[in-house]
Each structure stands twice: as C-alpha cells, then as structure tokens.
Amino acid sequence: MQRAAETHFSDPDTAGIVHLVDGLADLSRIDTNGLPIWRVRGNYEDYLPPVSSESGGIPRELMFEVGGYKILIMHGHRFGVKEDWERAAEYAADMHADLLMFGHTHVMFEKYLPTGTSLGYRAVGKPLCVFNPGSVGTGLYPSYGVVDLRPDGIIMSHACGGTVR
C-alpha cells in the first residue's frame, strides 16, 4: 500500500482512495495526503461488533459520483463474487452504476460490459465496468488498482509484480 501511496496519492489528478477492506486499519499506516476515502466493510469486519471503533459507521456498500460517473463499491462477499461476479454486476446494473468495484477474492479482475450485454435474465441498459483491484497484502501477485475516469470513458488498470511494500 505504501507504493500506491507514494505513486498516486500526491498526484493532483487523484480524486480519492477506494478501500474495499478486510483490514480497516491499513490506511491508518500511511499518509493519504488528505484525499477523500470511500470504503466499505468486508467479511472480516462482519465479525466485529456493529458499533466497534474499527467498523462503526462504515457501510457494506456505497454509491457515490465522481466526474459524472456513478460508482458502486462493495466487498463482494454478500454477492458470492468468489464463485461468480455476475450477480454483483446485475445488482450494480440495477443501481444504474457505471463502475462496480469489489474485493473479497484478493485477485485482480476487470471486465467491460457494453450496452446490450446479457447479464442474468436481461441485457445491460448502459455500459458497466466491473473491477477488482486485487490485494496489496495477500495473494500470489500483490496488486492495487488505478481507475482513470475520463470524459470519454473509464480506464481500469492494475499495478502489480514483486513484493509490494
């Protein structure tokens, strides 16, 4: 996470930080440069008391807007993303999101669904980007995600390789 902070948190084009959890304290260890932080509870936090100082007030999912794009973030465990990401994507489409970001699998993933793509029992009504940044702390290939919200579309990418410090 420190590498992500050093690379991106001081960039004037960085709008904020999305933290898809399993470890709410991770961000307290680095300088976030005063950026807004959007975060959701993970399955680990489900085992904490609902009013614990670590998890209190942090939602299970969150919808917000940046640059005209509607972004839905969730950890993903409640939608079974380890088995199939499409259920979470159906929900995001129902919420009229432009971008769905989820964690839980600790594996990088990205998918672009153009208008008309079959999803469940219907077609997607507008383009939807689906993105999992992976995990900076666990997994075979530590990674983090970078999402570039441009007027002409969304670019999803991963930074990975070697040990992330």
Question: Model-derived features: where do they sit?
Answer:
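N-terminal active-site segment of His-dependent metallophosphoesterases
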Residues: M1-G34, S52-E54, I58-P59, S143, ...
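Binuclear metal-dependent phosphoesterase catalytic core
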Residues: A5, G67, M95, S118-R165
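A short helix->loop->beta-strand "cap" motif at the edges of active sites that frequently abuts
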Residues: T14, L35-P36, G125-L128
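Helix-adjacent hinge/juxtasegments
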Residues: P36-E83
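Non-DNA-binding regulatory cores of transcription-related proteins
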Residues: E86-R87, A92-D94
